[in-house]
């Protein structure tokens, strides 16, 4: 009986060994000669200057960051940059200049959409006349910028304050963008503005932006009649501080492809600003006034050359 059981065990082991061989032969092999095509995916974005990849010290504010600052003019936002001195020559409508490393305003160039701005009247750029309503990005470069495609004046300056305006962007199925704002504040401040963007075709876009601001600027101050603590004082209002400005911009944008863009921009600005003086011997009369009219047209063409 034991021999029969042993014989059956050997037969069972022999059958299991030889019957398992065809099971391995039935496994499917991967066909490595076949080519599988993956659909093409195109990802596009607008080039923006970033602090993390800049070789020179760079500070910038995006449009979202400028909204959080609650600033009215470019001069108000520039004060939040580190290592910058914004000189204010008095009054709401006074001249406001920017300097880096205490080198003076003449060593800091102000660029508007990549074009250097000049002022033959004073030799210094008044950054108080630029509004933030049409600004997309505000950057300050301490030293040479990483952008090699810029005017020679940018390379010869100690710092660059670059103002980039908004480029029209449209959502899918939308061809018109209209934005209006109205701001008001103390001392008679009234500041309405409007922005219109229209897509003429897939390649051509036009935009127009206008702004008007008015303020009497008659803020109160305390006039002391002597240096002693018990001397008489009176509350006065600053005179000759009225400001009225008007700004208009129009732009034509050509987006021929992802590697070829062209823009044409026209800018006009005029202002009437009173310049108050210090109260000397209780005399607060001032009649000095400043009128400005600035206009320029600039064009920019940016092709991307490949296969060099």
Give, region by region, the residue ranges found by the protein language model.
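Surface-exposed beta-strand-turn/loop segments characteristic
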Residues: 207-244
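Transmembrane beta-barrel strands of outer-membrane/channel proteins
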Residues: 180-184, 208-214, 264-270
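A beta-strand signature from Gram-negative outer-membrane beta-barrel systems
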Residues: 132-179
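N-terminal periplasmic "start-of-domain" segments of outer-membrane beta-barrel proteins
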Residues: 37-67, 97
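Hydrophobic, lipid-facing positions within transmembrane beta-strands of outer-membrane proteins
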Residues: 39, 96, 157-159, 176-178, ...
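Extracytoplasmic beta-strand/coil segments of soluble accessory domains associated
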Residues: 75-116
């Amino acid at each position: 009986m034991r021999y029969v059981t042993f014989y059956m065990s050997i037969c069972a082991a022999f059958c299991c060994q030889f019957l398992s061989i065809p099971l391995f032969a039935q496994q499917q092999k991967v066909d490595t000669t076949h080519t599988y095509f993956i659909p093409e995916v195109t990802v596009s974005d607008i080039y923006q200057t970033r602090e993390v990849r800049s070789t020179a010290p760079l500070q910038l504010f995006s449009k979202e960051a400028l909204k959080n600052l609650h600033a009215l003019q470019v001069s108000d936002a520039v004060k939040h940059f580190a290592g910058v001195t914004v000189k204010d020559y008095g009054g709401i409508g006074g001249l406001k200049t920017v300097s880096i490393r205490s080198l003076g305003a003449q060593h800091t160039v102000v660029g508007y959409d990549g074009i250097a701005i000049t002022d033959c009247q004073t030799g210094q750029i008044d950054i108080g006349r630029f509004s933030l309503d049409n600004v997309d990005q505000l950057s300050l470069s301490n030293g040479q910028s990483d952008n090699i495609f810029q005017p020679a004046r940018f390379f010869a300056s100690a710092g660059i304050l670059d103002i980039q305006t908004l480029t029209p962007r449209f959502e899918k199925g939308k061809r018109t963008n209209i934005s209006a704002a109205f701001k008001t504040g103390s001392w008679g401040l009234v500041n309405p503005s409007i922005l219109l963007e229209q897509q003429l075709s897939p390649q051509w876009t036009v935009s127009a932006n206008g702004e008007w601001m008015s303020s009497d600027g008659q803020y109160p101050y305390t006039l002391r009649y002597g240096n002693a603590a018990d001397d008489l004082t009176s509350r006065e209002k600053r005179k000759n501080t009225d400001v009225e400005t008007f700004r208009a911009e129009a732009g034509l944008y050509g987006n021929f492809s992802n590697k070829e863009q062209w823009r044409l921009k026209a800018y006009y600005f005029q202002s009437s600003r009173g310049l108050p003086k210090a109260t000397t011997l209780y005399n607060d009369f001032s009649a000095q006034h400043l009128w400005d009219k600035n206009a320029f047209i600039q064009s920019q063409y940016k092709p991307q050359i490949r296969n060099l």
